[in-house]
Amino acid sequence: ETMDDPNDPMAIHIWQELSPMLLEGLAQLTLGGPMYIYHGGLMHVRFRYFDPVQKRPGLPTNLSALVERIEADCARLILANTDKLQTRDVIIQGGAFGEHQILSVLPDSKTERITVGGKYLNVSIGPSSVLRLNISMKRYANDPSYDTPWEKAREAVDLISPRRHDTTAIKIGD
């Protein structure tokens, strides 16, 4: 029996056969880069999103994102709030691991850039609204980490200590 047996519920591609929608394209358009399977398990994307109300990674409910254009030092991001009544807040991180420094943002509705100067950009978008953002960034300017906007990854868990080695020498032979 092999991993590609179509009758095996644990087959490698069973999720593709059961779901009429492939999520890879959606993730690429939302994050602004290829999926992790193309780069040794690491996401090389322009953005990552956090829901500040739920304190979790990902887009808030009823909020959509589309990375419309990518250039060497900037990207154009479109956010759409499909909720008819509620304003939505989102935290946009530069890169999957916060490795990109967001320098400034120019919303289509403004004539002057807003200086950011960090890896996070806080955005609030009204009900039934679309917001177009031109975001300038310095790529790979920050040390990558698993930090979230509300918790440092290093402080979240205890670090693993190495084993203590016995320094007693072992003599082999005479």
Predicted regions located by residue number:
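Catalytic domains of carbohydrate-active enzymes that cleave complex glycans
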Residues: 1-76, 82-84, 133
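Feature targets compositionally biased, intrinsically disordered low-complexity regions
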Residues: 32, 40, 116-117, 172
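Short, exposed beta-strand/loop patches in secreted or surface proteins that constitute
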Residues: 65-69, 112-114, 123
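Beta-strand secondary-structure signal
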Residues: 76-78, 89-91, 122, 132-134
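Surface-exposed beta-strand/loop patches in extracellular or lumenal glycoproteins
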Residues: 83-98
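Short aromatic-acidic-glycine turn motif
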Residues: 96-109
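Short beta-strand and strand-turn-strand segments in soluble, beta-rich domains
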Residues: 106-118
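C-terminal beta-strand-rich structural cap/linker in extracellular carbohydrate-active enzymes
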Residues: 117-173
